[in-house]
């Protein structure tokens, strides 16, 4: 129960994935944003399984790999922030495609918040007397997916809710600048 609460709080608080989901909802609507939502949940579920199961210890014991993930992830997130800021208005929601399932799944592996959440969970919620590392890690991954789906949907729906207010080009531009700036700020807060 403690981990589920942790997972809900981690999944619903602002961060790069939720900003991406909000932008997906605002620019393409809920239905076209669902693959992005499922990708975020899948990526975090896999990460929550693999990091506690052993990948995390490899990354933490290899400073160069950790540094590459740290700075490479930050660079990618800043690039994504720039793409959000500079995205132009298209004619219809049907023409706007948000980040898809695979992109959102892979995105979790370069998202600094995802690494912080999964390594924190590994250190906090794995217990030697609670069973094998594999079974505990599988439970963490499954529970995180259960928490991430409704939590991420809140952000996706929020974006879709503001979509009607963004028909005006000036408002859409301001919204995209704010979303991109928030993503860049989240990178700065996590990295430095």
Cite the ranges covered by each PLM segment.
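Anionic-ligand binding region
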Residues: 96-105, 111, 122
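Hydrophobic/aromatic residues within the transmembrane alpha-helices of Major Facilitator Superfamily
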Residues: 8, 12, 45-46, 53, ...
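Juxtamembrane transmembrane-helix termini in multi-pass membrane transport proteins
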Residues: 1-67, 120-140
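Flexible cytoplasmic inter-helical loops of multi-pass small-molecule transporters
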Residues: 86-100
């Amino acid at each position: 129960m403690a981990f589920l609460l942790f997972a809900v709080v981690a999944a619903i608080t602002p961060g790069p994935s939720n900003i991406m989901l909000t932008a997906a909802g605002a620019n393409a609507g809920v239905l076209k944003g669902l693959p992005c939502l499922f990708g975020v949940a899948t990526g975090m579920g896999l990460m929550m399984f693999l990091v506690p199961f052993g990948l995390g210890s490899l990354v933490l014991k290899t400073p160069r790999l950790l540094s590459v993930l740290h700075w490479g992830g930050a660079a990618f997130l800043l690039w994504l922030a720039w793409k959000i800021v500079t995205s132009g208005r298209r004619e219809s929601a049907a023409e706007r495609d948000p980040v898809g399932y695979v992109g959102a799944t892979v995105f979790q592996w370069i998202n600094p918040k995802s690494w912080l959440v999964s390594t924190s969970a590994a250190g906090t919620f794995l217990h030697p007397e609670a069973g094998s590392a594999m079974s505990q890690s599988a439970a963490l991954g499954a529970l995180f997916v259960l928490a991430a789906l409704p939590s991420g949907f809140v952000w996706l729906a929020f974006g879709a809710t503001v979509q009607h207010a963004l028909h005006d080009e000036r408002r859409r531009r301001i919204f995209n600048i704010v979303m991109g700036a928030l993503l860049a700020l989240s990178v700065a807060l996590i990295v430095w």
